[in-house]
Amino acid sequence: MDLQNYGAAPERVDFSKIKTSIPIPNLIEVQKKSYERFLQMDLLPNEREDIGLQTVFNSVFPISDFRGVSDLEFVDYSIGNWECKCGNLKGLHHLRSTCRNCGATIRTDPFHAGDILCHHCGTFNKNVVTFCNKCGDPVGLQLKYDMQECQERGMTYAAPLKVTIRLTVYSKDPETQKKSVRDIKEQEVFFGEIPLMTDNGTFIINGTERVIVSQLHRSPGVFFERVPAQGYFLGKIIPYRGSWVEFEYDNKNILYVRIDRKRKFYGSVFLRALGLKTDEQILRAFYRVSKMEIRDKKIYWNVDEGLTGLKLSHAITTKSGDTVVGQGKKITASLFKELQKAKIEKVEVAPNDLEGAHVVADVVDMTTGEVMIDANSELTTTVMSKLIEAGITEFEIFFPERDDVGTVIAATIRKDAVKTQNEALIEIYRKLRPGDPPTLDTATQLFQGMFFDPRKYDFSRVGRMKFNIKLYDRSDATALDKRTLDSDDFKSTIRYLLKLRKGIGAVDDIDHLGNRRVRAVGELLENQFRIGLVRMERAIKEKMSVYQEMSTAMPHDLVNAKPVMAAIREFFGSSQLSQFMDQTNPLSEITHKRRLSALGPGGLSRERAGFEVRDVHPTHYGRICPIETPEGPNIGLISSLSCFARINEYGFIESPYRKVIKGAVVDEVKVLNPGDTDYKVGDIVRRGDMDEANRKLGGKKQAAEFEAHCEYLSAWEEDKWTIAQANVELDEKGRIVPDLSNARQAGNFVLKPKEEIEYIDVSPKQLVSVAASLIPFLENDDANRALMGSNMQRQAVPLLRADAPYVGTGMEMVTARDSGAVVLNKRAGVVDSVDSERIIVRVEGAAHEGQLSREVGADIYQLTKFKRSNQNTCINQKPIVRVGQRVPKGAVLADGPCTDLGELALGRNVLVAFMPWRGYNFEDAILVSEKLVKEDYYTSIHIEEFEIEARDTKLGPEEITRDIPNIADSFLRNLDESGIIRIGATVKPGDILVGKVTPKGETQLTPEEKLLRAIFGEKAGDVKDASLYCPPGIEGTIVDCKIFSRKGQEKDERSKAIEESQIQRLQRNLQDEIRILTDERAKRLGTLLDGKKLLADLHDEKTNKRLLSKDTELTRELIEKMKSRDLKRMRLANKDPRLNEQIDEIEEMTSRQIAVLEKITDEKIAKLRKGDELPPGVIKLVKVYIAMKRKLSVGDKMAGRHGNKGVIARILPEEDMPYLPDGTPVEIVLNPLGVPSRMNVGQILETHLGWAAKALGVQFATPVFDGATEREIKKNLTAAGLPTSGKTALFDGMTGTQFEQPVTVGYIYMLKLSHLVDDKIHARSIGPYSLITQQPLGGKAQFGGQRFGEMEVWALEAYGAAYILQELLTAKSDDVYGRAKIYEAIVKGEAAIEPGVPESFNVLIRELQSLCLDVELMKKPREVPDTALAAD
């Protein structure tokens, strides 16, 4: 699907040479997919997989009480109320039908036009949706408050979670203790409201939009690393949940185990606890054992693989006397095979051949019962002679030195004093719980629970898969659902660790993306939910044990879901990964949702993260953007997903590649609908074969539908293959042209012949993130500047008039669509009406066979008008379609902030000259033409929200009113009779926005006040002014007021007026929907009766007046005017017998739909009139929105897309700006010295190409790493009649003279960033002081002062400005007495300064007193005796 055609923007001239057939996956799919898998909200209980919520419930339930007489079991859960508009159809089963082929249940989709696929058998079925016979609507999720209402009312956008729980009560036989079921009760328990994700991948929590950032953490599994200082190796088994185990050895070759980073103990203790009780069992588990026999005082070795590598003292001969291995010759692998071939079973060995051998088991003299040699003891020649003498016939040996595992296990067993399993368990308990007296039961319980209890230990499917890949080299070696460990797992781990000493195997790179995985929203929430459920489980168990009579208990008596909901609330409200959405512009929203953070619970911390974790790793290629990351302490810890990357079911990031076979790129497609071809759904077929199959069908049969296919590989899968870059030259048949190509192999760049290449990149874009892919000529910019460029695009403020860039990258359309900023059409149809606030699309439904189409009526799109974003920027949508236009599904109907005809537009195209101008653009400063200010190029609207609430106080209720004591009428001129400012009023700092009075406590009145009170009445005195005033720095227009009143409170006039306008809007929507339905009715009747002739006159039933005469031909206009009862009475030529039925059906369906629409509108109106749910104690809440127009001004920060940022130093009159030979003045002058040292040459190329684009009247797309070449830029400049150098003569606007050198001129896309001088400028006269130090507070938010620091004091000291210094350091700082005196002096007109004691001196005294030093201040100086001076 070509996305370009779905916006209204003109198509761009594309410079890319590599055409990518794979569309970019939906950019916010990461969030949506993860949360869908977690909730499984639209699935029936029997359709749900064991993931997300389902798996959490299954893992915590069933819950049994301590006595074992009752169980609580989880049955299923449901989220939200699924019903039609009128509530007649209830339940998700109405969105299901049965497959005609296999009889399985399949999901139907009311918004899908075509057939639907059965996932069991791959057959396509008719999409038969059950519609309600009253309202004509299918079942859908019905919510109490929609997203907009939640944002306005400060509520959470959520749906109710109901869980069906079964309580089983048993009775125990007192004698046999047998349990029998006494009672079973099942009940649906309301758990609470679970937040829902909006269509844009965000959550609305307490009225604000939040994003849950995905976390990048260490994957569970088994890891081996080298300890650099000591040079030995370390093995770790890291579970998803549970205890960590570490295995290590020291330079004495002793194996140690450490559990949960506690004290270490011998590895043999751990192995005994696992069930390898004796030394022999441990040795057999790790070493290769060979069997020896003694016959006729000679030693024979039973032939096995242990012989390889040995030199034998005796030659080996066959029965026929042929020598296979000569005396003293080493037995190689090939010689060993010959031994086997010759079927030699035993070979003679001399005692010295067994040097270094140890015995596996105790060797016992059968006659005396004496142990001749202990297990794990070395077999010396002396011992050998003893064994021969004692008549021992056989024993088993192993060679620790020669074995892959080495001497570690044997050495550890010798060192270890613990010899039995019970001792081992108690020893482990002592190490883990020092101080607790161990008993065998508690020790066994602790050890068993640590690794073998699924409730306490979860290795997870991911952990098991990583374990299999590492130790067995294939992901399915053991079952992935085996989520606890067993002794074999530990043995395999220890064996691998010990083999590493011999150089067998490889250590792991912890920063490899095969060892780091992404925890997205769903998984993070699943963990929170589990924490809550475990807390709830404890409470339930306690309740069950104290409940008197379980037979009368119901599940809801035992289940209290508060801890679960508290855990979820805490996660959304205060988790480090739940963040206030960055909503500056659509790009910042998308980037925030695609962000990956290594911080957060269970992750790293800024302080501990080293350089390696932050660095770019070869596996980031195509998965994580190497460019986009914040500057500062979080660099490298917070990153962004690449354009094409996706996250697989295990949480690993995958990147797409196309297959290469024998040097040719395979163009594959995936079958979506086989039609009449022989393929099945999901088959991967070569494009040529598919085209051929479709061609063979001819025009009559249904052709197959397909989409481009590529293979997604994870980081460790990718390491196995050789992968070429996307820009490898291919011929027209897709064959690689050069014999040697650049390729990647296991993270290294290599040159490979084309036959060895196995995959090729999908697109050059796949390396970078969305923000970086929007930078044209990214390949010509230094990486540091590209980083700044991609970060600064996210700070661009939405401008009053958006303007798409002349030089884009082709990603603008995709980004704008997926961000949710633009309005997309849900169903194909025709635009019925358009105004600034809404768009109505008349839906054209396709009728099914013999059925009337249900898909009639209209889609009404309410546009967002001047809404405040999280960052106080303005969200405003403007329609870009016209009435009568046909719009396909997915077309852009309206532009949002920062979009222009469906394309992302963060800034404006401006004419730029690179030249110095009188020092005003020194050091990155920017010189701007006044034209940009006059023509509102960079004017933006910012909306501030202020709220005030009237509460119930102890002294009486607060009141929102116009009647404020001691306030002049001029201050109240803009307030209405309710005390709330009118919309459209212009306000400045200090103006009253909402008048409010608060009752104040009774005070003792003076006689004069009593007299005044008696004359002027009681009211004025007992209330004080608590109005909402406009704060400093805010100057603008009131654009909206929202008033929320508590239920049952009398509404004021303003509330009623607002309510009335909302009701009118609802009724207007209703009228439009009814109009469309009646039009549709007339249209359908028209198609039924159009062109039919009357056989007789038609008279009115009541008046008998002739309505139509005989032989009249019916037209649509006539039919529309007539009533249905008259239509039914007409006698028509060749009238269809079912005609009257069809007329009835159309009429009935229309009237039913109208009735339901009216009912829904009435409900909405009733909800409006009912009053609002407010926090306790709040009577009324008023929100006032002020829109401020921010024009471009000196001090604003501007930037290009290449990291070229600067601050406006001067706004110059248009006539003074340098101008082109044709008299056009330039709009911005930048300093050319900002380019060479920064190495962001991309901006110069953009300047040239932008100039050509403006002159040719086209827009260009130059995708990253595949953009316009220098030759192409020159070609376009020539076509536009511009100099190919990109330079031209410029003239000084002030003098009219020509500048000496030609100057680079062209169009650059410049952004205004959200660092506006109006938000930063700040001044203080008198303001708040810190309570303890009595020094002024700092910062604009606190209305603070400017710090006069140590160095500034030195400067004044250098000038000897003593009085200024004294005033700064005392009266203007913390001399409380002094500042009061200065105020007095100013009032009296005196100029004296009387200093007091600075408060910091008092603070110092208090500090010393707190250290128990008795410091007293003397009033008078003490007389110093002469003797003391003499002594000095």
From Swiss-Prot:
Query: Its Gene Ontology biological processes?
Result: DNA-templated transcription
Classification via PANTHER family = DNA-DIRECTED RNA POLYMERASE I SUBUNIT 2
The major lineage groups are: Bacteria, Pseudomonadati, Acidobacteriota, Terriglobia, Bryobacterales
Care to name a GO molecular-function term for this sequence?
DNA binding
Say if the entry is tagged with keyword Nucleotidyltransferase: yes
GO terms for CC?
A: DNA-directed RNA polymerase complex
Q: What class of enzyme is it?
A: transferase
The family database entries (NCBIfam families) matched by this protein are listed as: PRK00405.1, rpoB
InterPro entries named among the record's database cross-references: DNA-dir_RNA_pol_bsu_ext_1_sf, DNA-dir_RNA_pol_bsu_external_1, DNA-dir_RNA_pol_su2, DNA-dir_RNAP_su2_dom, DNA-dir_RNAP_su2_hyb_sf, RNA_pol_bsu_bac, RNA_pol_bsu_CS, RNA_pol_bsu_protrusion
Instruction: Tell me the subunit arrangement.
Output: The RNAP catalytic core consists of 2 alpha, 1 beta, 1 beta' and 1 omega subunit. When a sigma factor is associated with the core the holoenzyme is formed, which can initiate transcription.
According to its UniProt entry, the function of this protein is described as: DNA-dependent RNA polymerase catalyzes the transcription of DNA into RNA using the four ribonucleoside triphosphates as substrates.
- Cystine pairings recorded for this chain: none
Q: Which family does it belong to?
A: Belongs to the RNA polymerase beta chain family.
The organism is Solibacter usitatus (strain Ellin6076)
Q: Which reaction does it catalyse?
A: RNA(n) + a ribonucleoside 5'-triphosphate = RNA(n+1) + diphosphate
HAMAP family, A to Z? RNApol_bact_RpoB (MF_01321)
Asked if the keyword Transcription belongs to this entry, the reply reads yes
Gene3D superfamilies recorded for this chain? 2.40.50.100, 2.40.50.150, 3.30.60.280, 3.90.1100.10, DNA-directed RNA polymerase, beta subunit, external 1 domain (2.30.150.10), DNA-directed RNA polymerase, subunit 2, domain 6 (2.40.270.10), RNA polymerase alpha subunit dimerisation domain (3.90.1800.10), RNA polymerase Rpb2, domain 2 (3.90.1110.10)
Protein's recorded name: DNA-directed RNA polymerase subunit beta
Q: What is its EC number?
A: 2.7.7.6
List the Pfam families hit by this protein, alphabetically: RNA_pol_Rpb2_1 (PF04563), RNA_pol_Rpb2_2 (PF04561), RNA_pol_Rpb2_3 (PF04565), RNA_pol_Rpb2_45 (PF10385), RNA_pol_Rpb2_6 (PF00562), RNA_pol_Rpb2_7 (PF04560)
- SUPFAM superfamilies in the record, alphabetically? beta and beta-prime subunits of DNA dependent RNA-polymerase
Q: Which UniProt keywords apply?
A: DNA-directed RNA polymerase, Nucleotidyltransferase, Transcription, Transferase
